[in-house]
From Swiss-Prot:
Topology of this chain in the membrane: Single-pass type I membrane protein
The protein's name: Putative potassium channel regulatory protein sup-10
Cytoplasmic side of membrane: 323-332
Domain of life where this protein originates: Eukaryota
Protein localization: Membrane
Keyword entries, A-Z: Glycoprotein, Ion transport, Membrane, Potassium, Potassium transport, Signal, Transmembrane, Transmembrane helix, Transport
Gene designation per UniProt: sup-10
Single GO term (MF): potassium channel regulator activity
Extracellular side: 19-301
């Protein structure tokens, strides 16, 4: 028993340390040395771009002027066709392969020149003919594919929240609110997809009933938080908080999701909360009305009426006091 408690404390300390040192800790295994220090300029570039975006690396073992001209042009046209802006844009970099480096696995890389795609803590090697534009474009398109759920009404989102009871469905709820945009949300969505998690984009502003659904069925979510990034699994949810760094999210997904052994593997309860049962019609009506009253009380007109009424009461009190002070209360 003591040994089990000791192991639990070690894991907990690791996770806390991991959370408090995000930028330096969440470096992919194929980058840098054991202490996380990059060994080359290319490694530094990969790490920097993967922190919030993604990139394709052209690797040549000798001069390849034509490929260095063609590949960035093809990639630029692909990005323009998709209408991508940073950080969703797939960026480009070049590396001459002269000696062994951590980000090139010779067991995966069959030929040179070659292309390697980086996103989160994942890399994918092309191993095709980089001279054939159609093949390169098809490869990029397959990596770029994003299957996104966008619930439009209360019932759509309600079904998603209830769909993890079979211990196989996994979802990541994301939002990109106008008042606090999250530019990397699509990168995070693709990372989740690579882990077998269905990304879900929640539209804003939320209607009253959908707002009630989110914060009543997941009561530990902070309504004051501007961002939304919530992992759903096994009738439970885990809130990533406001910092949606792709490298952090990728590492946290692998940390939070257990190795699937059996139908319903145990979750690390410290970071998970149970999703509350579906709301009854009466609860929907009550909580929606409660929210409407709360929102109305925040409006300037209601605040002004309350303030004016308060000042009027104070003035009336002073008038009565001075009136009494000058008449019956003054016996002299």
């Amino acid at each position: 028993m003591r040994y089990a408690v000791f192991i639990f404390l070690i894991v907990l300390i690791d996770l806390i340390y991991c959370w408090n040192s995000k930028r330096s800790f969440f470096i992919p295994d194929f980058l840098g040395s054991g202490d996380g220090t990059p060994k080359s300029k290319t490694e530094s570039v990969i790490e920097e771009r993967m922190e919030y975006g993604r990139m394709i690396l052209l690797v040549c073992n000798k001069t390849c002027a034509k490929h260095r001209s063609d590949i960035p042009l093809w990639l630029k046209e692909f990005n323009q066709k998709k209408g991508y802006q940073e950080p969703e844009t797939i960026t480009y970099y070049y590396h001459t392969y002269r000696q062994a480096v951590s980000f090139i696995d010779t067991n995966e890389t069959d030929v040179f020149p070659n292309l390697i795609y980086f996103i989160g803590v994942k890399r994918v090697v092309f191993n095709g003919d980089v001279n054939i534009r159609e093949d390169v474009n098809d490869w990029i398109a397959s990596l770029d594919q994003l299957i996104l759920l966008e619930p439009r009404v209360y019932e759509d989102l309600n079904v998603i929240l209830s769909d993890t009871s079979n211990c196989s469905s996994k979802y990541l709820l994301l939002a990109d609110r106008p008042k606090c945009p999250q530019p990397s949300w699509s990168i995070v969505a693709r990372i989740a997809q690579d882990h077998g998690i269905q990304p879900v984009k929640i539209g804003h502003p939320l209607d009253g009933l959908t707002h009630v659904l989110l914060y009543k069925r997941m009561p530990y979510l902070s309504e004051a938080s501007c961002h939304l990034s919530v992992l759903l699994y096994e009738n439970s949810y885990s809130d990533f908080g406001d910092d949606i760094n792709p490298l952090v999210v990728s590492d946290w997904i692998t940390t939070l999701l257990p190795l699937e052994e059996g139908s319903c593997p145990a979750l690390f309860e410290t970071y998970w909360h149970p999703i509350v049962d579906e709301l009854t019609e009466l609860q929907q009506i009550f909580y929606s009305a409660e929210l409407e009253i709360s929102e109305r009380n925040k409006r300037p007109a209601f605040v002004l009426v309350g303030l004016t009424g308060g000042i009027a009461v104070i003035i009336l009190a002073f008038s009565i006091f001075w009136g009494l002070n000058g008449s019956g209360f003054n016996k002299d």
